Amino acid sequence: MKILVDENMPYAEALFGRLGDVQTVAGRAIPAPALALADALMVRSVTRVDGALLDGSRVKFVGTATAGTDHVDEDWLAQAGIGFSVAPGCNAIAVVEYVFSALLWLAQRDGFALRDKTVGIVGVGNVGGRLQRRLNAFGVRTLLCDPPLAEAGAPGDWQPLETLVAEADVLTFHTPLTLAGRHATWHQVDEALLAALPAGRIIINACRGAVVDNAALLQALEGGKPLSVVLDVWEPEPALSLPLLARVDIGTAHIAGYTLEGKARGTTQVFDAYSAYVGSDERASLAALLPPPAVERIRLRGAIDEEALRLLSHLVYDVRRDDMQLRRVAGLPGEFDRLRKNYYQRREWSSLCVETDNSIGADALRQLGFQARPFAG
């Protein structure tokens, strides 16, 4: 079997090599000759998968090592009889920790306590649900908005977006991009929402760029609207708005979900799905793939307060590093994608074991995603 895999999927060449002949390709420019000979295609969100790409090929299976599927025409794949697999939740923890890193940095810079803020979460799926649980574990009040889940009768204290706009200090977006329908998310943050948003609010977008009307946001910021803005995704990509980047507080190159664990989960999930599809018993072990982290263990004494959490969070991942790197190269041809392709081995909080003399603090850290254990003395 001939298997094409995106060159930025970690461990993909070795894993899929167990099942066939592997060729790595650039996701934004898959060579037509390679595609013509492929039996399977493994992609990320940068590849649009539809009839224009695959019609006439012999591809029988597509896997996307991403949680979202708005880059895939699933209806066309089904009609063409092509198998399909996605990696739900693969990078959810990474995005949650990106949001925490950004909020803890803003709290330090602006002199507020995160526990004193109300965070409005728009989209309460794999990412939003995990974010809610971690924020609540840290004592932060959350407001939840997810109309499709509310209509489906899912348990939760669901609120309309207007309530979040009025009451939440932070609005963080974790929805798919949907262009039509009653619950379309395209330009969910538009000129009207920005006008209604009280001064001093924080907006975070780490889902899809077009959920926020970037032109309207730039106009609001240039007009003096006092907002703090964190953008990991842009409209469009990779040719993001340089004037908007200059105005936001944190800007990064669509890397919120780019932990080594998150990317490896995406690869292993689609590998397992394809292996089952072709009738193989081969399965991937995430733990066996991951290398030791740069910092494996740290010992703390005393209470685990917000400052301690900020230091621990930023020891593992400090969002300012990615902000600095994007600003350094923004506007240079190919550099947005180069940052993503050559992204360093960022780890998740679970890679760090915190030893503490505070048993209550150890429990809290475990709820937040760290390894933690008490010590005496």
Swiss-Prot record:
Active site residues per record: R208, E237, H254
EC assignment: 1.1.1.290
Keyword field: Cytoplasm, NAD, Oxidoreductase, Pyridoxine biosynthesis
InterPro entries documented for this protein: D-isomer_2_OHA_DH_cat_dom (IPR006139), D-isomer_DH_CS (IPR029753), D-isomer_DH_CS1 (IPR029752), D-isomer_DH_NAD-bd (IPR006140), Erythronate-4-P_DHase (IPR020921), Erythronate-4-P_DHase_dimer (IPR024531), NAD(P)-bd_dom_sf (IPR036291), PdxB_dimer_sf (IPR038251)
Binding site for NAD(+): D146, T175, D232, G257
PROSITE patterns the UniProt entry points to: D_2_HYDROXYACID_DH_1, D_2_HYDROXYACID_DH_3
A cellular-component GO term for this protein: cytosol
Subcellular location: Cytoplasm
Catalytic activity, as annotated: 4-phospho-D-erythronate + NAD(+) = (R)-3-hydroxy-2-oxo-4-phosphooxybutanoate + NADH + H(+)
A GO term for molecular function: 4-phosphoerythronate dehydrogenase activity
Pfam families according to UniProt: 2-Hacid_dh, 2-Hacid_dh_C, DUF3410
Biological role: Catalyzes the oxidation of erythronate-4-phosphate to 3-hydroxy-2-oxo-4-phosphonooxybutanoate.
PANTHER family from the UniProt entry: FORMATE DEHYDROGENASE 1
Protein name: Erythronate-4-phosphate dehydrogenase
